Amino acid sequence: ALTELRCQCLQTVQGIHLKNIQNLKVLSPGPHCAQTEVIATLKSGQEACRNPAAPMVKKFLQKRLSNGNSS
């Protein structure tokens, strides 16, 4: 399968509660996309793009980094 070189997050979703998020995946800027992308995997299995500058996203990432759980 051919993957397109473009941003995965065309729009971001607001108002997802932390308790509904199973995991956050952070994609750094690169040739495929000029911006940092944050993709939340919800407990329902859905994926939703979040704004990397959103306070909740920053808090979640800081908590994860301080736990020493890097992935």
UniProtKB/Swiss-Prot annotation:
Q: What is its main location?
A: secreted
Which residues pair up as cystines?
A: C7-C33, C9-C49
Q: Which UniProt keywords apply?
A: Cytokine, Disulfide bond, Growth factor, Inflammatory response, Secreted
Q: Where in the cell is it found?
A: Secreted
Q: Which GO terms describe its cellular component?
A: extracellular space
Query: What induces or represses its expression, per the UniProt entry?
Result: Generated during an inflammatory reaction.
Matching SMART domains? SCY
Leader peptide range in chain numbering: none
Give any GO molecular function from the UniProt entry.
Answer: growth factor activity
Question: Which biological process, per GO, is one annotated for this protein?
Answer: inflammatory response
What InterPro entries does the database record attribute to this sequence?
A: Chemokine_b/g/d, Chemokine_CXC, Chemokine_IL8-like_dom, CXC_Chemokine_domain, Interleukin_8-like_sf
Q: Which Pfam families does this chain map to?
A: IL8
Spell out the CDD domains in the cross-references. Answer: Chemokine_CXC
The entry sums up its family as follows: Belongs to the intercrine alpha (chemokine CxC) family.
What is the protein's known function? Has chemotactic activity for neutrophils.
What is annotated about its quaternary structure and interactions?
Homodimer.
**Per its record, how is this protein called by name?**
Permeability factor 2
Q: What does UniProt list as this organism's lineage?
A: Eukaryota, Metazoa, Chordata, Craniata, Vertebrata
